């Protein structure tokens, strides 16, 4: 009987436009940021769903892996990509991006202004031209227009040699309230040191480990600055010994929990602004 009276009073309160006590209100689901480290074998593909709904894609693996990324995004009902980022010119990063552009509408495009051009990068540039997309320069200090999120490139901080394409990597720092992420592309020790010297914002709870866990990156000095709680290595079967025990040990000594796409498959990190959950 009491429950029935309470329901009647609640209905009258709503009709009359009266405020409903907080104890009676149904809490709306808090916005989250979701980062999908898509398993594309030996290479990178990262999809970010921003709290306000924007879709961001960083790389799409090697040529042929674009289809994997497209299928994954379509399962999530992604209709367009607000921001696409090519971290640098390596084939295992940009190789799959043309296929994504040919299947899903892309609204804006960013890439570092490297002097190095690979066949995969040329294909990426040509596809962008066909789609009438202007490639905006990704470099330290450039901010991305994402609502409710501070997304800013922290690298590259300088120019590098023509053959030094890994250090040209667009390094992106993303912060949603207390959730922090650092996406490193294939930036190596030289670029890491340059970012540290430039005093860029590198501290992040979630670190995308550079170059599939190569010993040429993820130095102890860099990890000590980033202080990651979680480290994701996007890696597949390879002949390079990736990830190296040196890199994995450096991360574990820093008390970071390590996830690998060759073992864990696609890794999804969800942040609610204060904490994280990790799943598939």
Question: Where do the PLM segments sit?
Answer:
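Non-globular, low-confidence helical/coil segments that flank catalytic cores
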Residues: 2-280
